[in-house]
From Swiss-Prot:
<dbReference type="Pfam" id="PF07317">
    <property type="entry name" value="PilZN"/>
</dbReference>
<dbReference type="GO" id="GO:0009425">
    <property type="term" value="C:bacterial-type flagellum basal body"/>
</dbReference>
<dbReference type="InterPro" id="IPR009875">
    <property type="entry name" value="PilZ_domain"/>
</dbReference>
<protein>
    <recommendedName>
        <fullName>Flagellar brake protein YcgR 2</fullName>
    </recommendedName>
</protein>
<dbReference type="InterPro" id="IPR023787">
    <property type="entry name" value="T3SS_YcgR"/>
</dbReference>
<dbReference type="GO" id="GO:0071973">
    <property type="term" value="P:bacterial-type flagellum-dependent cell motility"/>
</dbReference>
<dbReference type="Pfam" id="PF07238">
    <property type="entry name" value="PilZ"/>
</dbReference>
<keyword id="KW-0975">Bacterial flagellum</keyword>
<comment type="subunit">
    <text>Monomer. Interacts with the flagellar basal bodies.</text>
</comment>
<comment type="function">
    <text>Acts as a flagellar brake, regulating swimming and swarming in a bis-(3'-5') cyclic diguanylic acid (c-di-GMP)-dependent manner. Binds 1 c-di-GMP dimer per subunit. Increasing levels of c-di-GMP lead to decreased motility.</text>
</comment>
<comment type="similarity">
    <text>Belongs to the YcgR family.</text>
</comment>
<dbReference type="InterPro" id="IPR009926">
    <property type="entry name" value="T3SS_YcgR_PilZN"/>
</dbReference>
<keyword id="KW-0547">Nucleotide-binding</keyword>
<dbReference type="GO" id="GO:0035438">
    <property type="term" value="F:cyclic-di-GMP binding"/>
</dbReference>
<feature type="domain" description="PilZ">
    <location>
        <begin position="131"/>
        <end position="244"/>
    </location>
</feature>
<keyword id="KW-0973">c-di-GMP</keyword>
<dbReference type="InterPro" id="IPR012349">
    <property type="entry name" value="Split_barrel_FMN-bd"/>
</dbReference>
Length: 257
């Protein structure tokens, strides 16, 4: 039987106080949580587990999204491994590639994985996945690209393909020379983002990272990193679905080690 994934009220409050402002970066969709944990598996990243004044260093070994559970390696100290199953809560922390991943779960049970001691636990209901310099980004489709369209301040129009996407912003790629003169801090108002089957969003974009690149043929292109000035709730939920689906597709195409 899958253990109850609901957070006790006092534990939820403690977790919220600990993470504070980072709550804006919380992942709550079970599929996205599973994707984040699978990235720890693929990267063989070390994870610290804290419980009852103890700590072990482990790795996530397997993620079962269908049954909402995951498996992690046993620690190197027998006493800690013996104490872990009776812990009221387990706090996991990792820093893969500068991205802070943190979550809390409960009721770990001893198991075996590939014939070696391990633990199994329910997927967390909330996972905080925070990249210090920018949100976690996914590449957008190449064959059926997403499109950003709008108008310059002088009234001229633009229509550009998205290079990547995150909950915090987008990157645009273009040969349009007008984008070469746009400075950091420029705001593009009411930009329409055509996101394939997810529909269209209208958001204001602030240019934060403009740069030039050269193609293999030596042609000049402009890559414009933009952040969303604001993301209303419905827009953020749509972006979450897009990021989840794109990353899930990418993971499905990545060979498992």
């Amino acid at each position: 039987m899958i253990a109850d994934l609901s957070l006790d009220a006092d534990v939820a409050e403690q977790t919220q106080q600990t993470l504070g402002a980072d709550s804006n970066f919380a992942q709550r969709h079970p599929l996205q949580i599973a994707v984040c944990l699978r990235q720890l598996v693929a990267g063989q990243d070390f994870v610290t587990v804290e419980f009852g004044g103890r700590q072990i260093v482990t790795q996530i070994l397997d993620v079962d999204s269908r049954n909402a559970r995951f498996v992690f390696d046993a620690g190197s100290v027998a006493d800690d491994n013996d104490a872990l199953p009776s812990a009221r809560q387990l706090t996991f922390r990792s820093l893969p590639g500068g991205i802070r991943t943190e979550f809390t779960t409960f009721d770990a049970t001893p198991t075996q994985f590939d014939g070696l001691p391990a633990f199994e636990a329910p997927l967390p209901t909330v996972l905080h996945y925070v990249q210090r310099r920018e949100f976690f980004r996914v590449q957008t489709p190449v064959l059926d690209p997403y499109i950003a369209s709008g108008r310059y301040a002088d009234g001229g129009s633009f229509r550009l393909e998205l290079l990547d996407l995150s909950l915090g912003g987008i990157a645009l790629k273009t040969a349009d020379e007008r984008f070469g003169s746009l400075e950091r801090g420029t705001v593009l108002r009411d930009v329409a983002l055509q996101l394939g089957g997810f529909g269209m969003l209208r958001l204001d974009l602030e240019i934060v990272a403009p740069r030039q690149v050269s193609t293999a043929k030596g042609d000049r292109r402009f890559v414009i990193g933009c952040k969303f000035v604001a993301t209303p709730g419905p827009a953020e939920r749509t972006l979450q679905r897009v990021v989840t689906q794109l990353e899930t597709r990418r993971q499905a195409l990545t060979p498992r080690r």
